[in-house]
């Protein structure tokens, strides 16, 4: 009697490289490939274990001298927006969010390029070409969608495919226990709209509507100002050596936003 078994995933370790978040630190990552019939199942398990997806790779930090990167997920069903978040929702009441299959467009890349050039000129993604962007969007073996956020045009009906200005977009995985925001970007000239916050709020709304408990935000790095925004979305859980634990925001310095 022959018994066929699914091969176990193979994990690899990257060479040390400069940390993009904390000066004077070196980063290493452990990673595996998300391919085959169990890719979605593995993505669920690994994301719940602190991994992130990039194309067909799942990775997590494996740094020798630092444990600053902490996986964060919002408890979507308990979430209520703060006063400042309600103002963000009001400021974007003219925005239509539409979900599509993970297919890239030249319009998306143009906005993505503007975002990188303004926000991440020195980052590891700064030299991404249109082909690189297409691979980032399409190279997935899990349930990945792209959500476009467009300005509503005067006289456009809700039943029509929105054609207004593309303001932002989010590449998102739908998992068994939540939504994972893989990558998002927006028009950097529209700072007053707080589009990054708006997209997270919209994903919480989507998770609630789907009955999913979590929205995964990736890693929070205490001491990195560019990551501070993630702790504003309460309640949330952080992945610790003891498992997922509810985060106590009173342990953080007071936020100037509320």
UniProtKB/Swiss-Prot annotation:
Protein name listed in UniProt: Aspartate/glutamate leucyltransferase
Gene Ontology molecular function, alphabetical: arginyl-tRNA--protein transferase activity; leucyl-tRNA--protein transferase activity
Disulfide bonds, paired cysteine numbers: none
Entry EC number(s): 2.3.2.29
Main location: cytoplasm
Localization: Cytoplasm
Native organism taxonomy: Bacteria, Pseudomonadati, Pseudomonadota, Alphaproteobacteria, Hyphomicrobiales
Biological-process GO terms, alphabetical: ubiquitin-dependent protein catabolic process via the N-end rule pathway
Organism from which the protein derives: Rhizobium leguminosarum bv. trifolii (strain WSM2304)
Catalytic function, reaction form: N-terminal L-glutamyl-[protein] + L-leucyl-tRNA(Leu) = N-terminal L-leucyl-L-glutamyl-[protein] + tRNA(Leu) + H(+); N-terminal L-aspartyl-[protein] + L-leucyl-tRNA(Leu) = N-terminal L-leucyl-L-aspartyl-[protein] + tRNA(Leu) + H(+)
């Amino acid at each position: 009697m022959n018994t066929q078994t699914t091969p176990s995933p193979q994990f690899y370790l990257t060479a040390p490289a400069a940390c993009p978040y904390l000066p004077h630190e070196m980063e290493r990552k452990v990673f595996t490939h998300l391919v085959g019939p169990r890719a979605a199942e593995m993505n669920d398990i690994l994301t719940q274990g602190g991994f992130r997806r990039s194309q067909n790779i799942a990775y997590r930090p494996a740094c020798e001298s630092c444990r600053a990167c902490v996986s964060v997920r919002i408890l979507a069903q308990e979430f209520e927006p703060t006063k400042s978040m309600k103002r963000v929702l009001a400021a974007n009441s003219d925005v239509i969010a539409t979900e599509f299959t993970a297919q890239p467009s030249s319009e998306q890349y143009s906005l993505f390029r503007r975002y990188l050039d303004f926000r991440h000129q020195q980052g590891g993604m700064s030299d991404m070409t249109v082909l690189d962007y297409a691979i980032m969007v399409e190279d997935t073996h899990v349930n990945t969608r792209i959500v476009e956020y467009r300005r509503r045009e005067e006289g456009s009906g809700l039943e029509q495919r929105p054609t207004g200005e593309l303001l932002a977009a989010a590449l998102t995985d739908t998992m068994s226990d939540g939504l994972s925001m893989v990558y998002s970007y927006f028009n950097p000239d529209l700072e007053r709209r707080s589009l990054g916050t708006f997209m997270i709020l919209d994903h919480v709304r989507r998770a609630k509507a789907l009955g999913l408990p979590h929205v995964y935000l990736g890693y929070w790095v205490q001491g990195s100002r560019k990551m501070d925004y993630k702790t504003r979305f309460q309640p949330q859980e952080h992945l610790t050596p003891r498992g997922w634990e509810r985060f106590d925001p009173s342990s953080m310095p007071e936020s100037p936003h509320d």
